[in-house]
Amino acid sequence: MKKHNIFAAVLSALLAAVSGCKSVPKSAVRVDPLLLLDNESSFYLRIPSSADEKLISRVVQGAVKGISESDARLISSRIDVVYAGLNKKRTKTDYQIAAFCDFPKAAVSKAFSRKNGWTKDSLLLNDGDGNPVEYGIYSDGRILASFPEQMTACVGRNVPSMVETYHNAYYNLSPSASVLDENIYSWLCFDSENPDGKIKYYASKPQSFLTMLTGAVLNFNLVYVRGSIESDPKRDDQFVMDFEFEFRDKKFVPAARGSLAVAFGLTDSDVYLETPTHLVVSNIKISKEQLYNILVL
């Protein structure tokens, strides 16, 4: 599926609906959207809107072909944090999206109507006391979307399972409602009370991620790559990236350090071993435009 197709239908439909709506006061989010992602992705990403004022808007513009800058800002102003899990394949990229947002129920019903090319299926689940709870699952034939509450959006792969995870967590129907690996969750989780304002990523299949980032085939026998990205306080057009590499065998570390120095240019970066198999590389400079092109889904 082309990248424009992932968010395009969803955001285009919502655009018409929310443009005439006043913002609704935000109540507490009842279930953390990050819990709704599954373990089937090879790369995970957290993008808080506070990380860069243009980034969420650029994600919208990159997804919706032809959308104006002002319309993209309108949509992005209602999105606080985007969590994404993705698998890049030869002909398409498979996505799973969960987000903190603010899309009123009336706007969702208006946007995701049959008139606009959407069909709605009902997912009925039991609340644990014998009472049915209904959730709407919307489809345009290519994309699935659901809004289990006003401040939670689910888009992409396995949306019914995401909604069921939400339901189980909200009604305390299982001890551990989420199936997302705890290491991934703990790295990406966002504390709204004490936000760090950073983009964070976790590659559980790191070889393909490094190839995407550097353009080179780097095989270091890694367990994972994770890190964070934030705006460079000294340059408005630049990000600063940190990487953490966990190796299966320490013998790969020396070769990796040399290859990474060539790939990233580590002259001004800090490189050190936290453990014999855990290499940390920080203070890597990358232009915002370059990162936008990588991260815009």
Language model: regions and residue ranges:
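An internal, short helix-loop-strand segment that often contains or flanks glycine-aspartate motifs
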Residues: 28, 32-82, 121-141, 146-237
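Short Gly/Thr-rich strand-loop-strand
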Residues: 106-150, 262-278
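Leucine-rich, highly hydrophobic segment in Treponema pallidum outer-membrane-associated proteins
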Residues: 196-297
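A short acidic-to-branched-hydrophobic micro-motif
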Residues: 81-103, 230-249
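Bacterial signal peptide processing site
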Residues: 22-24
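C-terminal motif of bacterial Sec signal peptides marking the signal peptidase cleavage site
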Residues: 18-20
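Bacterial N-terminal signal peptides that target proteins for export
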Residues: 1-8
